[in-house]
């Protein structure tokens, strides 16, 4: 009897040391998965599209929620550091568009490829880099993913080719990556992203043509967040059906605020490309909460009421949270714990990004030539070490 009472006492004392929310989560029986109806995609030159129902497992749901919250909090921290003048130069934030970067990654393999424009922080994270490396790159520190030399627009990871600052210029590069996949006989695809503001660039249509001629495994993806730098899509494009812009290339228009819609559409598009049918085009209808960049608040060409309406009705994190709670895939308390953990991760990363040293001046000449450069050119050394760059 004494042994039994002692065992019960140990169990109770262990439980009392844990937060009440953790005890509740541990004792609750959650569903392993749930089936959801998702919005049907608009189709162009396709007889069938992605499914209109999908299964979400508890494990995947928790992973997607954590990833989207991490991207959201990371971008808000970048906003704060920029306003403190710790981050300088160009900086384009993607809060509001988390379902795009997380959903696209959920629909492909790690060995697949991705290239995007300058709003790249979220994709850099989903492709496998840490928040520490991203924030340190934003602050120009040695521990950044590009040694502090790339900044907001030029981050890279394995099978992730940036981060490109010239509007639309990454699209032909993406077609070239897809050409390499086909040439090397690999069962891989390249996700080639651009925004609605770049969709009228001539080089994009040239890339469409070559990709279709050579049947390249390229998924062209237009992130339509409704506005270019400060111009609505209706004022910039004669046709806002961006998923039809490929003409001879099949296309999908996808709810880019719903991570499950994005995931299923990406799986469908990737399977299409892997089957040897050639390229496909996806338009993700999404929304950014910040302005085009940190140089503008983003309320001179749209109202604060419009932004708030999207936040209250279509926020991608809120949508996933409601689905998981209502289908017993997670509890409110469990998701709050994730929120707390994410906030701590972001704060720790921000401390690292502000305390890490800046790269030394000699770093300026590294990673330019594939082999040792000819330092002496016409009797001059262009990489002579100065005490200051000013």
Swiss-Prot record:
Q: What is its EC number?
A: 1.2.4.1
Per UniProt, where does thiamine diphosphate bind?
Answer: 118-119, 165, 167, 196-198, 225, 292
A UniProt-annotated Pfam family: E1_dh
**Domain of life, source organism:** Eukaryota
* Location of N6-succinyllysine modifications: 63, 244, 277, 313, 385
Q: Where in the cell is it found?
A: Mitochondrion matrix
Look up the record and name the cofactor or cofactors this protein needs.
Answer: thiamine diphosphate; Mg(2+)
Residue(s) carrying Phosphotyrosine: 301
Q: Name one GO biological process term.
A: tricarboxylic acid cycle
Identify the SUPFAM superfamilies for this entry: Thiamin diphosphate-binding fold (THDP-binding)
Q: Which UniProt keywords apply?
A: Acetylation, Carbohydrate metabolism, Glucose metabolism, Magnesium, Metal-binding, Mitochondrion, Oxidoreductase, Phosphoprotein, Pyruvate, Thiamine pyrophosphate, Transit peptide, Tricarboxylic acid cycle
Q: What is its main location?
A: mitochondrion
The record's annotation in PANTHER family points to: PYRUVATE DEHYDROGENASE E1 COMPONENT SUBUNIT ALPHA, SOMATIC FORM, MITOCHONDRIAL, PYRUVATE DEHYDROGENASE E1 COMPONENT, ALPHA SUBUNIT BACTERIAL AND ORGANELLAR
The protein's job, in short, is:
The pyruvate dehydrogenase complex catalyzes the overall conversion of pyruvate to acetyl-CoA and CO(2), and thereby links the glycolytic pathway to the tricarboxylic cycle.
Q: How does it assemble?
A: Heterotetramer of two PDHA1 and two PDHB subunits. The heterotetramer interacts with DLAT, and is part of the multimeric pyruvate dehydrogenase complex that contains multiple copies of pyruvate dehydrogenase (E1), dihydrolipoamide acetyltransferase (DLAT, E2) and lipoamide dehydrogenase (DLD, E3). These subunits are bound to an inner core composed of about 48 DLAT and 12 PDHX molecules.
UniProt-recorded name of the protein: Pyruvate dehydrogenase E1 component subunit alpha, somatic form, mitochondrial
**Natural source organism:** Pan troglodytes
Upper classification of the source organism reads: Eukaryota, Metazoa, Chordata, Craniata, Vertebrata
């Amino acid at each position: 009897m004494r042994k039994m009472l002692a065992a019960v006492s140990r169990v109770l004392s262990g439980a009392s040391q844990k937060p009440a929310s953790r005890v509740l989560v541990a004792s609750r029986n959650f569903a392993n998965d749930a089936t959801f109806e998702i919005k049907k995609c608009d189709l162009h030159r396709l007889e069938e599209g992605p499914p209109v129902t999908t299964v979400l497992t508890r494990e995947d749901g928790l992973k997607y929620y954590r990833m989207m919250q991490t991207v959201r909090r990371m971008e808000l921290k970048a906003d704060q550091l920029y306003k403190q003048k710790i981050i300088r130069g160009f900086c384009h934030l993607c809060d509001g568009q988390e379902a795009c970067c997380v959903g696209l990654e959920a629909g492909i393999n790690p060995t697949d490829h991705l290239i995007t424009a300058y709003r790249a922080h979220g994709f850099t994270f989903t492709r496998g880099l840490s928040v520490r490396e991203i924030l340190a790159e934003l602050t120009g520190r040695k521990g950044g993913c590009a040694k502090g030399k790339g900044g907001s627009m030029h981050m890279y990871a394995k099978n992730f080719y940036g981060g490109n600052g010239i509007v639309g210029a990454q699209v032909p590069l993406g077609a070239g990556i897809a050409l390499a996949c086909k040439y090397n006989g690999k069962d891989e695809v390249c996700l080639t992203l651009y925004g609605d503001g770049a969709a009228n660039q001539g080089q994009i249509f040239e890339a469409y043509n070559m990709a279709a001629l050579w049947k390249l495994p390229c998924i062209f993806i237009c992130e339509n967040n409704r506005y270019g730098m400060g111009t609505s899509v209706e004022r910039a494009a004669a046709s806002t059906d961006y998923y039809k812009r490929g003409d001879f290339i099949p296309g999908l228009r996808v709810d880019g605020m719903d991570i499950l819609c994005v995931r299923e559409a990406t799986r469908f598009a990737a399977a299409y490309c892997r089957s040897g049918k050639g390229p496909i085009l996806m338009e993700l209808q999404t929304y950014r909460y910040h302005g085009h960049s940190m140089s503008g608040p983003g309320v001179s060409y749209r109202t604060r009421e419009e932004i708030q309406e999207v936040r209250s009705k279509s926020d991608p994190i809120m949508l996933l949270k409601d689905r998981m709670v209502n289908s017993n895939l997670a509890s409110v308390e469990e998701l709050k714990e994730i929120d707390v953990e994410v906030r701590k991760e972001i704060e720790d990363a921000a401390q690292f990004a502000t305390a890490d040293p800046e790269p030394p001046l000699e770093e300026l000449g590294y990673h330019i030539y594939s082999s040792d450069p000819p330092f002496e050119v016409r009797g001059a050394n262009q990489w002579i070490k100065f005490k200051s760059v000013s």
